[in-house]
Amino acid sequence: MVNLNGIPPRGKRNYYLAIGLEGSANKLGVGIIKHPVLEKHEDSDLSYECDVEILANIRDTYVTPPGEGFLPRDTARHHRNWVVRIIRKALTEAKIDDPTKIDVICFTRGPGMGAPLHCVVIAARTLSLMWDIPLVGVNHCVGHIEMGREITGAKNPVVLYVSGGNTQVIAYSEKRYRIFGETLDIAIGNCLDRFARTLKIPNAPSPGYNIEQLAKQCKNKEKLVVLPYTVKGMDLSMSGILQYIDTLAKDLFKKNLKNKLLFDSRTGEQLVTVEDLCYSLQENLFAMLVEITERAMAHVNSNQVLIVGGVGCNVRLQEMMAQMCKDRSNGQVHATDDRFCIDNGVMIAQAGLLEYRTGHFVKDLSETIVTQKFRTDEVYIAWRE
């Protein structure tokens, strides 16, 4: 059994308050949540009985012009300019007049982009010193998983973590989130974002979302553009697919009539549209994700899938995963909307507060060093059986 009342709340209250700061990429988020103090059981307290009340979930995104990505230094400048305003807005929305009543400050320790991570941890350290509140450094992926579990009610699913910087298939075992499969090169979100740059489509609200909308407009869904399909056991590779479809898109824009895949060799008629390329890319990438996820489900004998991360908002990915689960003894797919799929401060507060309640928190500021590389399976999950 897991005791989640290991550390009592401040002021002898019957609830805990946590603030979470997320800024590992171009999204800066601040979330504030409340946990109840659990009733005592004969053995101890069970982690799944911990109901979360979301008091604030504020976010701002650094958006670049079409055709451009976001550089670490520019993203960090955005975070520095906005972090104080967003923290104040979150406190106001949560109706917290005295911040010293907060039990713990949670921040993203990694993985992520170095400069933005440093901006967030500096803000967290400052608040900790000002308010005399302990700190907890949170693994970004674990934050996604714990928020997804809480929102959807998934018990012990296979987790598909798909975002701009990560692509992993994960399952819980013996106090760790074990990685069963992952990308061998670039993440799926990075693949979609870079193709969006080639197409020079807007980055707002996100490149992947705009590719999804173009894919929906495809009028020739019966005939896919043939793309590389690279699955190696439980792992997958997407750099070759990106390079290939980038070349096709550039030939399409240049009207390279020598490319017989895009143009009729006799008449010069265009055979493929930008919408066709977006649709085929999605179908190809998502089929690879479904394959390795199903393989993990068979390995751990699970019939549930939890999709987390920014790409998890994609409706087509959810549909394909749902069809696979339906074919596997009426399995279930769990996913959240963009409030929780996309990076946010609430997920950091959730994972951090669970860690804090089991007695794990930063004892000295020297322990708050952020890292760009922080594996999901490095974290000891003390709050689960």
From Swiss-Prot:
Binds 1 divalent metal cation per subunit. GO terms for molecular function: metal ion binding; N(6)-L-threonylcarbamoyladenine synthase activity. Component of the EKC/KEOPS complex that is required for the formation of a threonylcarbamoyl group on adenosine at position 37 (t(6)A37) in tRNAs that read codons beginning with adenine. The complex is probably involved in the transfer of the threonylcarbamoyl moiety of threonylcarbamoyl-AMP (TC-AMP) to the N6 group of A37. KAE1 likely plays a direct catalytic role in this reaction, but requires other protein(s) of the complex to fulfill this activity. The EKC/KEOPS complex also promotes both telomere uncapping and telomere elongation. Its cofactor is a divalent metal cation. It comes from the Eukaryota. It comes from Kluyveromyces lactis (strain ATCC 8585 / CBS 2359 / DSM 70799 / NBRC 1267 / NRRL Y-1140 / WM37). This is tRNA N6-adenosine threonylcarbamoyltransferase. It is an enzyme of class 2 (transferase).
